[in-house]
Regions:
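Acidic-basic catalytic patches of nuclease active cores, encompassing PD-(D/E)XK
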Residues: 1-27, 103
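Domain-level recognition of nuclease-like catalytic cores that cleave nucleotide substrates
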Residues: 83-131
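Active-site metal-binding core of divalent-cation-utilizing nuclease and nuclease-like domains
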Residues: 18-45
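Secondary-structure boundary/capping motif
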Residues: 20-21, 46, 108-113
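Residues at secondary-structure transition points
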Residues: 3, 7, 32, 59, ...
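Conserved catalytic cores of phosphodiester-cleaving nucleases, focusing on short active-site segments
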Residues: 37-58, 72
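Mg2+/Mn2+-dependent nuclease catalytic core
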Residues: 53-78, 82
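Active-site donor-binding loop signature of nucleotide-sugar glycosyltransferases
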Residues: 28, 50-52, 112
């Protein structure tokens, strides 16, 4: 399974680079957890979690969600603490792959995957004039 995950991270790196992202690092680890891919999308620093499943196991693997938010944010904070260039927006993406054989896969890229994990606070509105 580790080999499958490594192949999925390589495929994700290639996918992101073909879409104009600059991949800074793969497989970054700290005590809080791992960040599969760190990249930039224009001025935004993007932390990407990669999940993979063999086609024989069924459809796309589930990406992370609200339950993983704390772990991912803690790992991102540790990453930012170790690196100089931190004055930029940050985003969390998910990439899920279903692999068919040695060289084929379906890939799903969920941009800003943790945006749904932010609780809706009643009465929280934008100031007038802000859209």
């Amino acid at each position: 399974m580790k080999d499958l995950k490594e192949r999925a991270i390589k495929a994700t790196k290639l996918f992101l680079e073909r879409r104009g992202y600059e991949v800074i690092e793969t497989g970054w680890e700290c005590p809080a957890g791992a960040i599969d891919v760190v990249a930039t999308d224009d001025e935004t620093l993007v932390f990407v979690e990669v999940s993979v499943r063999d086609a024989a196991e069924g459809g796309f693997p589930e990406g992370s969600g609200p339950k993983d938010r704390g772990r991912r944010e803690t790992a991102a904070i540790a990453y930012l603490a170790e690196h100089e260039d931190v004055d930029r927006p940050v985003r969390f993406d998910d990439v899920s792959l279903v692999v068919f054989g040695e060289s084929k896969a379906f890939l799903r890229h969920h941009i800003n995957a943790l945006s749904d994990a932010i609780p809706d606070i009643a009465g929280n509105t934008l100031p007038s004039g802000v859209a």
